[in-house]
Amino acid sequence: MAVNDPIADMLTRIRNAVMAKHERVEIPHSKMKVEIARILKEEGYVRDYAVRGSGPQQRIVIELKYGPDGERAITGLRRMSRPGRRVYRKQKDIPRVLDGLGVAILSTSQGILTDHEARRKGVGGEVLCFVY
């Protein structure tokens, strides 16, 4: 089955795996998805990620993170910019997620960045998703 929005598919797979308390989730590979996984790891939302396989069978394996009592590190994932409705923001208009407790992931001219990095570098871009 063809996926019209690969980023939304990635976020949905992660959301479903977290709700089902899975240890890891496998996602079809793309460069943008690897960058999103990198940001999720840097921000402490996932334990680790790895790219497995080669060629068209390449996959991203994301190890999910839970607290000592099984509480989820990711409580919410929300897709903002979609293929049918793109959302772009200037540097001064980049939204704060839960007053800074969450993170917005943006696609900018300088690569895939968090809202904090984009503000610091003075760039705007397409708001891909919110993570909290």
Curated annotation (Swiss-Prot):
One Pfam assignment: Ribosomal_S8
SUPFAM superfamilies xrefs: Ribosomal protein S8 (SSF56047)
Entry's Gene Ontology cellular component terms: ribonucleoprotein complex; ribosome
Keywords: Ribonucleoprotein, Ribosomal protein, RNA-binding, rRNA-binding
GO biological process terms held by the UniProt record: translation
Gene3D superfamilies cross-referenced by the UniProt entry: 3.30.1370.30, 3.30.1490.10
GO molecular function: rRNA binding; structural constituent of ribosome
Keyword tRNA-binding annotated: no
HAMAP family assigned: Ribosomal_uS8_B
Function: One of the primary rRNA binding proteins, it binds directly to 16S rRNA central domain where it helps coordinate assembly of the platform of the 30S subunit.
Name listed for the protein in its UniProt record: Small ribosomal subunit protein uS8
Gene symbol of the encoding locus: rpsH
